[in-house]
């Protein structure tokens, strides 16, 4: 996927099993992740549906790259 905006380098929907493992490792429930609406341009670009977990890779001036995860919610 090409560069989208605001330093975002990559946006992908992670597979359900990978999302389960991630949540288990982080000791979180899905709703405890930050949310992103399905209507958000980043979510639409990735083809995300409510209930999916997005992996977003951004440029960071201090870390080089920052990886964040978002739960896709309706809207």
UniProtKB/Swiss-Prot annotation:
GO terms for cellular component: cytoplasm; DNA-directed RNA polymerase complex. Keywords: Cytoplasm, DNA-directed RNA polymerase, Nucleotidyltransferase, Transcription, Transferase. Part of the RNA polymerase complex. Its main location: cytoplasm. Its EC number is 2.7.7.6. It holds the Pfam family RNA_pol_Rpb5_C. It is found in: Cytoplasm. DNA-dependent RNA polymerase (RNAP) catalyzes the transcription of DNA into RNA using the four ribonucleoside triphosphates as substrates. This is DNA-directed RNA polymerase subunit Rpo5. GO terms for biological process: DNA-templated transcription. Belongs to the archaeal Rpo5/eukaryotic RPB5 RNA polymerase subunit family. It comes from Pyrobaculum aerophilum (strain ATCC 51768 / DSM 7523 / JCM 9630 / CIP 104966 / NBRC 100827 / IM2). GO terms for molecular function: DNA binding; DNA-directed RNA polymerase activity. It catalyses: RNA(n) + a ribonucleoside 5'-triphosphate = RNA(n+1) + diphosphate.
């Amino acid at each position: 996927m090409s560069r989208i905006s605001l330093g975002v380098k990559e946006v992908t929907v992670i597979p359900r099993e990978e999302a389960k493992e991630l949540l288990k490792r982080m000791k979180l429930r899905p709703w405890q992740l930050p949310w992103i609406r399905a209507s958000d341009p980043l979510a639409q670009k990735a083809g995300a549906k409510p209930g999916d977990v997005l992996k977003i890779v951004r440029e960071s001036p201090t870390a080089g790259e920052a990886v964040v995860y978002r739960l896709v919610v309706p809207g």
